[in-house]
């Protein structure tokens, strides 16, 4: 048997090593010129006006919610089928996460579900662009505008994703992730884009101790060595080591996503003859970033449960992932919201399985996964 095929592996090369070496030799390794270049590059990529690099997308979500003054007594609408960090940040600020159901086949939160969940206490809506495909963000943003509610796009899966001809994050506020498995990575990191100048200014303060400027800004412009604390803030800045890696990855984005698309197409063709159900694609015009390739493993239909399939793949030297276990089924949220029922979310949470998908995979690697799936389906 070949070596273990992981669910994901970052596509790192000599360019990333050279970028890190350049920063280490520059004498400026924390937040500095590479951060500024990364922020400018994302403004160019998305077409938005402001970009703020942070240490993680979770950090970005935290300070965005804070900047919007979300706290005790407020409600924030979000799908349950998302990474729990969003729910955690809402809860840690004293607000209430209002979890809504998703479309059964795309796993996208719908405008209808969002609007039905709005109350006088709703202060924000957080739609998720899921697995590399976009939610219907125009319709969701229209709801936010109609009710005067902020929309924060969870774009953690969305680098290289386009919706109706525009890159995700072209307007409004969106948060991207550079975590190790994302389409571009710098190990850990994130970035917020926004067209709200006041929000951008608050985010820059909140990410760096509540100061109006950072160390590089003082170094570059000769500002006073002791900056003024304007508001209590956090230490959520991104180092230039990480930013340099992200910049190098961004140059490769088209190539990386093209390879992801080729592997996804290979899976799609093979799955047409198998009982495992891939996600449906959104009906609106889009370019898929193929962050994840997810199948649904229904035991009655497939003759094997999701958990058994993942274990069988592991025995064959193939990794798989679960994106995600529904947040409202996790212990803390289950106890906090014991009567919450989200049928589509729960059905999928029990069946979804993410197959290996990363740019350095070969055609033979994908064939190996397909062969294993055929065997497990009894073919």
From Swiss-Prot:
Keywords from the UniProt entry: Aminotransferase, Antibiotic resistance, Lipid A biosynthesis, Lipid biosynthesis, Lipid metabolism, Lipopolysaccharide biosynthesis, Pyridoxal phosphate, Transferase
Annotated GO MF terms: pyridoxal phosphate binding; UDP-4-amino-4-deoxy-L-arabinose aminotransferase
Domain of life: Bacteria
Gene Ontology CC terms: membrane
GO biological-process terms attached to the record: lipid A biosynthetic process; lipopolysaccharide biosynthetic process; response to antibiotic
Modified residues (N6-(pyridoxal phosphate)lysine): 182
Alphabetized SUPFAM superfamilies for the sequence: PLP-dependent transferases
Involved pathway(s): Nucleotide-sugar biosynthesis; UDP-4-deoxy-4-formamido-beta-L-arabinose biosynthesis; UDP-4-deoxy-4-formamido-beta-L-arabinose from UDP-alpha-D-glucuronate: step 2/3; Bacterial outer membrane biogenesis; lipopolysaccharide biosynthesis
InterPro entries found in the cross-reference section: ArnB_NH2Trfase (IPR022850), DegT/StrS_aminotransferase (IPR000653), PyrdxlP-dep_Trfase (IPR015424), PyrdxlP-dep_Trfase_major (IPR015421), PyrdxlP-dep_Trfase_small (IPR015422)
Assigned EC number: 2.6.1.87
HAMAP family: ArnB_transfer
Protein's UniProt name: UDP-4-amino-4-deoxy-L-arabinose--oxoglutarate aminotransferase
Gene that this sequence comes from: arnB
